[in-house]
Amino acid sequence: MGQVLPLVTRQGDRIAIVSGLRTPFARQATAFHGIPAVDLGKMVVSELLARSEIPPAAIEQLVFGQVVQMPEAPNIAREIVLGTGMSVHTDAYSVSRACATSFQAVANVAESLMAGTIRAGIAGGADSSSVLPIGVSKKLARVLVDVNKARTLGQRLKLFSRLRLHDLLPVPPAVAEYSTGLRMGDTAEQMAKTYGITREQQDALAHRSHQRAAQAWSEGKLTNEVMTAYVPPYKAPLSEDNNIRGNSTLADYARLRPAFDRKHGTVTAANSTPLTDGAAAVIMMTESRAKELGLTPLGYLRSYAFTAIDVWQDMLLGPAWSTPLALDRAGLTLADLTLIDMHEAFAAQTLANVQLLGSERFARDVLGRAHATGEVDDSKFNVLGGSIAYGHPFAATGARMITQTLHELRRRGGGFGLVTACAAGGLGAAMVLEAE
């Protein structure tokens, strides 16, 4: 086991997560169509503060993330502060770590708390797949810059004459890795082939995810951590996630064709997480500050770890790399955990990471560790479903997972929980949480 790194302040205070909240998650171009991420972020932070009854002035820092950034609001964190009635003196900055963005936001606030520069802060993230920064071609972009410098009408017309019709077409946001040109689904297909993950196994995990998420909603387990959203044109509120298949049957998944490798693939739209809109946030503070304010924390941040691997082959192995580090830093083993919540970007990616956590060979030959991290107990794993069912607004998923896991730990009488995710660029994130 590696070095234990206690997450405490200089006074010995633990890092408390006192409350968390999210919007319902909505499939692309449905309930939140036309609502930018910054508005979703304002919505959730406003409601989170109202429910917590914490004076806004008590929040000294807000760290927020957005993966699909909009040029008109590049610092989403500061816009949220200015748009929610918080003190204008509240420090605010934005972060981005692909699908692990709100993991990073939480880590940053934790570091500020440990350094003693703040005593309370908010961390979270928001993304919209329905409001996207549609760009222009490189040639048109260059001409527009040159036109701005041109002095005469003739010079401007000459510049525009260089353009062809195809140069005027809009350019949607890239869906592939900048460095490799590979889409996330291509990597999921790689992993399915490398680790022998069958189509049947992927479909079964997706079905399980929807079943458990639907059950969590029907049993009222998510009611207190998901707000009701009212958005223009205000025809109907959204109070639950709209991607979950309440009547999921395994036979339905077999009907879909592969989405990436269309001839020989096994990754489909149904066993992958969909493009989604939503926002989530958590309030964090030192343990002593929570006591001063009369607050009972949901739980505590015990440890965290971030990792990075090569992007060309099987790059979505972040959980298999980051989990053992986070456990070492918490002074725990996988067997000590009450719950394990892994981000389901794709069923293939999820199953590959589960497989490698239990692999002695991977631990020895790749991680350089004496023993495997451990076999994942199915009764502890994604017990309320995962991202395949809930959806995945990139920057919001980590905060959703943290809030959801802490609530479930408390329902079970406390214990330790792991939340972990892969991310674009070969990145990985893992956090160990504790509830009493």
From Swiss-Prot:
Catalytic activity, reaction form: an acyl-CoA + acetyl-CoA = a 3-oxoacyl-CoA + CoA
Primary residence: cytoplasm
Subcellular location: Cytoplasm
Entry keyword set: Acyltransferase, Cytoplasm, Fatty acid metabolism, Lipid degradation, Lipid metabolism, Transferase
A cellular-component GO term for this protein: cytosol
Keyword Aminoacyl-tRNA synthetase: no
Protein name: 3-ketoacyl-CoA thiolase
Organism: Escherichia fergusonii (strain ATCC 35469 / DSM 13698 / CCUG 18766 / IAM 14443 / JCM 21226 / LMG 7866 / NBRC 102419 / NCTC 12128 / CDC 0568-73)
Lineage: Bacteria, Pseudomonadati, Pseudomonadota, Gammaproteobacteria, Enterobacterales
Encoding gene per record: fadI
